[in-house]
Amino acid sequence: MYPGSSQSRPYQVPPPPPMSPPLSQMHQQMSFVPPPPPPLNRYQTTPNLGASAPPPPPPGPPPASALNPQAPWNGAWGGVPAPRQAYDNRSGMYAQAPIQQYNPQAHAATAPGLNIPPPPLQTDAPMSDTYNPGQDPMFDGFMPDLSFDLEQETMGSSQTWQTTSSSSTNTASVNDNVQSNAPTEERTRRNNSASITGTQSSSNVPGIPSDITASWSLDKVIAWLQMNSFSRDWQETFKSLNIHGAQFLELGSGHFGRGNFGMMHQQVYPKLAKVCTASGTGWDQPREREEGKRMRRLIRGLVHARAVPDSARVPSSHGRQGSINSRGNDKGTHDGSDSPNTPSSQSRSTTIPTFPDGSSFSNHRGVLKNIDIDRHSSPKLNGDSPAASPNPVMASSTPKSSTLSVSPHSSRFGNNVRNSTDSVKAIYGSGIPADAQKMMSNSNLDELINGRGARQSPSDLGDNSAGTDSPVSARDTKLPFRQRMQAKDIDGNLSSPNGEGSLSPQMYRNGLGLDDYLRFKKPGGSIYLMATADGWNYRVVDVTDVETVLDLRSEISRGLGIPDEDGVEFYLTELGKSDHSQPLDDNQLMNHNKSRADAEGTLKLFVKPPPMSQQSTWSAGDTGQRHRFGTSSSMSRQQNTLKDDQSEEARLRAQREYKAEIDRKGREYLAIRKAKLESNNNGLSSSTEGIGIVGKPVDFDTPRHSPYEDKNTDRMFPTRNAPAPPVAPSATLNRVNSLMTGQRRVQGSMDGYPSQRVPPGVGTTTSPKEMSEDRRRQPMSGSQPMGGITSALVDMGRNLGGVALPNRGVSANNVPSKPSPPYRVATAPVSGRDFVSPDNRAAFPRSQTAGDLSPISQMPANFAAYQEPNPSPRGFGAAPVSSAAHKRAPSGPDIDFTEPEVSFDRPAPSTAQNEAQSDDDSGDDSDDGLFVIPIAARKASMKKAKSRASVTFDASDSGDGKRPALTVNTARDRKSVSFNSPQSARTGDDDDDSGRQRRTPKSDMWDSEDGKLGRRKSFKMDVWANRPPAEALINNLEDFFPGMDVDQPVLEEGDQEQNIDGSPVAPSPIAEVDETQSPGHLQINATPLNSLPPSRVQSMYNESDTLGSDESTLKALERPPSFQSLAQRSVRRSGGLGRMKSIREKARGAHEAHKRYTQTSMAAPQGLSRSGGTPATETQPTQNNSSALLRRKSTKMFNANIVQIRPNRDSMLVPDIPQDSISSSSRGAPKHPTTFRWFKGQLIGKGTYGRVYLGMNATTGEFLAVKEVEVNPRAAAGDKKRMKELVAALDQEIETMQHLDHVNIVQYLGCERKETSISIFLEYISGGSIGSCLRKNGKFEESVVQSLTRQTLSGLAYLHREGILHRDLKADNILLDVDGTAKISDFGISKKTDNIYGNDKSNSMQGSVFWMAPEVIRSQGEGYSAKVDIWSLGCVVLEMFAGRRPWAKEEAVGAIYKIANGEIPPIPEDVQDTISPIAVAFMMDCFTVDSHDRPTANKLLSQHPFCELDPNYNFLDSELYAKIRGTY
């Protein structure tokens, strides 16, 4: 209250003013006016002040200036009156010179001249966020407020009241290096007229040191933009706006650490839009917004990288004992800017003198303006001070006066009563960025929204509780009505929000109100969650920018003020929930954060600190009478009002009282909630019992009709009679039939696709499901009906007329399709090109399903050029006829044929039937019906076609109504059907065109529609067989090797596949059998070679051979003793006797050679002839097996020249690369070609470190699996060490595997090293892994498990004999071929050792957890041996029996714990009831916990009964083969 004024002066209290008067005016008046006497009966002067004490500050400005910045300030000193205002009824006030309009930007920096000594070093143990009175002798029975830290409140104790008052209401520019105790009018004018650019160009941007801002000139900013790839438009924008220095750095680090949004949106983006428009680039708002975000992130990184660490700051020398350190982890080197509770003010807090009569003096508002801002951190030197100088004049610091306030109705100095949510940190938690703590003290709403300079918020003057008699505050009008009533009930009247007992949630940081900040935040722009450590007090944590679980845990821990340790547990919770039993793991925590966290804080987490964590037992947000004191900056050190002689008992008593108060409040709260719940339940039950509506039972079978339903459904009856069925053909129909007879129209569908005819008594109807991809999965067996055209239009009738095409296949029920006219060509794109319709009619292309391998993707791109249009007009077919049309009179054209007799004959088989097939592939199209090929064929082609071992339809030239004659060749295992084009339909130009017509993917080796590979199905869907067999690869080379013309003759035929006399090559003279075979078997398998000429078998090898493999097929053909083959090859080439072969022919030749030399021989003891024995598919022969498979191995290419062939961009020709290098050895013998050419095809798999592609050795025609691993340092994010380790692991894998050769191990064929990748060539295995087969088809039968186990154990025994540990044996790493062969793969973590069954201490924990042996997990420095693979094999056997992995009910951690404790994987009960005891015994032997007692691979293979060969077993008869054979 002002002197001389009346206490009963009523007037309306306007909102709070924006800022206290300028510092210079305060100093000017304080220099000439003596201090006023204290008012009577209200305040009492502080004792011990002495005559030298500075005068107290004047009263703060009236609250009316909050919404009226023009209102002058009336505060004056002593008897100097202020000008009277409209609301001021005081009399006797002297006139005062008008004060210039206040410019907030001019006072955004710290006033110079305030020599504040640095704070003392914190030598004692730091406190946690929650204060415990028994830990610090300073606080005697008081609880400090925990909403804000006070680390950077740096005001010296030698500062006077005058300086404190002025610094709390005003700031001065850093550029004005003039002492603040001698201000002038010129300085005041310069401060008030400071512009935005000038202020920001100086170093007064909060959180940015001045040395950084001074170094960023405009040229440096432009160069920085150019270096970071910002466009010329951005550079021109910054030049035109002259953005540099602090203004530039503030774009990314100012304003709560998120950048100056106002400047970006009001200046930068509008100017950028103009520049982009003027330059012709065009304004793309989303793109430029993303660029803006990137720029702000880069700027923020610049500022943070230059932050001055606390370790570089000069410690303070003053020994005040009144400092507080409320951060449990705030040590000497901790940067307060990184803490979520970073203080918002940069000034030292003050310890306020205690007056005996509980009163103070009238000039208290400026000193105690910020008492309601929560602070609890120790005062120390500002971390942003340049060069860690103790001088507190810093760019980002604003000295404030005090941390205590008083109410006009109370004379006690203390903290306000607050709810747990009445602090900014309680609401924002750790969500406010690191710089926001410092920014909020110097920013206001206008600055945040408009991007202008720092001006204090109207809410910054929190001193509107004094100087008026009316208790109504303008800020209280913003509160909800309920909170205002609560505040009124507590205090007896509607108290000021800054007064004692206020419940107003006016949480702000040195002036920025919560409402202002929330208005600044974009709606929906941030994501919050609520966290609590005690179930009572919740902190709001901003998780908007959280991307990893580590960041999320750190943010929550920092928000709650607990250490970020590994033992912190998180639970889902709700309000009032007290039991938390199931903690969240990292994945669950991130999933809940992504799905439930929103702008309203729906996600609530209960955080349980680790048991040994130094956490206080009280929450940082507890309410109650919390009193906080700071260190005094307004009086000397001797005037500390805290009593140092307070006893330990008093502190303990205060602690006990505080705990009792918190417990009492908790019990009261729970009692109130319980009462409310009970009352709600009682009210609900009473209302239900008393006035509840009891409805009649609802009968859902007879629902009532809604009056809003449409009643038209009740009148669904025929509105007219059905038309009478036709009794006899009409005249028009007869005319159509007569015309159709002469033209020999064939039937088809309306859209140009062929539909099949079903003659009476032939086959059964085909369901429409054949249209889908499932028809590709029909069994591939010689006895099964061959696949044919799909019944896509079966619902429209099977007797549709239309356009069909010559086809060599039959339908699913062995019914041939009709040939089609040649005038339609489908218009579907092939490799970027389109097929055009010569008759310009609209085509009706069928949409291709995922499993439909239509020939439209297989035909050559220039296929349309070879189609000759037929000028003869043809119409579409007749109307659809139902399947039962033969029961009544026909309603459409009669296009039936008379059925001829079908004769079967058995022509002599021809070994060259593939080559004898005609080049006229007009009948080679598939049944999909997407192509219509001209009805053109030559007589020679007809004659050749008749000799094919296939079903052939011969169409006569007469054009009568009879079907072509049908002949079936039963000599082949798989019958195929083909249509030969009628000769009557061809034109004169057809001879040349048909001869030049390229082969379609459905070439002469295509036997069945069932065997056709649906590549889209196999590669893009979750099917087991992702590696097709060789037959499917050959027939679909276009799909697997895109961009290459596989039918163009580009490869010159050499003598690798054929000798001079044309006889096929011989297999390797070395018996390619495994070491487990007896000598008798070796002799039996080698007998087929005796019939070959000696010159063909004899071969000489040297150790220095570059091919590196004795089993190489190329070595088998090497004939050093004679130069005749080389000379004959040269003569043949020079004389034009050689021929070029296409890629398809090369692959087919290699495949045929492989099939020819895959011979089966019967065991001699059984006395069976080679023709009378049953071939066995068991590929691993043992001593008691009945047959052995002579395997033709792939060519190894180690140490050879490997060249990858890449087609040119505009040409599909293969580059000409010489493949022969003639050199002489010491004996003068010519060397064999050492150059291998290969093509890379489609991706067939990928893993952690690389990808697997399909490849083909163009030199030999063999298919390969190419494992390609990138070794580019950029692929490892610049981690060169990791890349070196990867390359070393690959080298070790190649070195280990290149010499291995076993039927049950995937062969390593070669290696090619490039600058950025390493390619490993592996043996191509068709099919998939056992693991994928289990997931697709379920568990295996015991006979299959026994066979696969024996094969896997055989390969494992071979590895152990070679000294190799696999260490990652599981079902996913065992490949299963379609013939039942198991092959061990994935040797990425295998290791070679000398003592295979001896424990190696260097063996680390490697492998998959659920397949690990106990000694791998609990090695304890002893290491382990190769017997870990035996344990893994037992897990694989259990996996095949159960259909799921071992330890299926356990997670990884639980499985590790149980394995380490010596437990074995449990065998499910359903498995134990179905398998034999021998199988259980085998698994128990593998699961021997003691590795010394665990059997070896050889022992199990040779002695265990489960590994005995079953002579009656055939994989082709198993249920598993029946499931997987239709996969292709």
Swiss-Prot record:
Reactions mediated catalytically: L-seryl-[protein] + ATP = O-phospho-L-seryl-[protein] + ADP + H(+); L-threonyl-[protein] + ATP = O-phospho-L-threonyl-[protein] + ADP + H(+)
Bias (Acidic residues): 917-928
Domain of life where this protein originates: Eukaryota
Start-end of Polar residues biased regions: 174-183, 191-205, 318-327, 338-363, 409-418, 613-622, 630-641, 846-860, 977-986, 1086-1111, 1158-1188
Composition-biased stretches (Low complexity): 1-11, 22-31, 157-173, 396-408
Phenotype upon gene inactivation: Leads to hypersensitivity to cell-wall-degrading enzymes. Reduces significantly numbers of conidia and develops appressoria in a slightly retarded manner. Impairs the ability of appressoria to penetrate into plant tissues, thereby abolishing pathogenicity.
EC number: 2.7.11.24
Biased composition (Basic and acidic residues): 328-337, 642-652, 698-714, 1001-1012, 1142-1152
Function of the protein: Mitogen-activated protein kinase kinase kinase; part of the MCK1-MKK2-MPS1 MAP kinase (MAPK) signal transduction cascade that is essential for appressorium formation, penetration and invasive growth. Beside its role in pathogenesis, the MPS1 cascade is active in conidiation and cellular stress responses. Targets downstream of the the MPS1-MAPK pathway include transcription factors MIG1 and SWI6, as well as GSK1 and MPG1.
Assembly and interaction partners: Interacts with the adapter protein MST50 and MIP11.
Protein name (database record): Mitogen-activated protein kinase kinae kinase MCK1
Organism: Pyricularia oryzae (strain 70-15 / ATCC MYA-4617 / FGSC 8958)
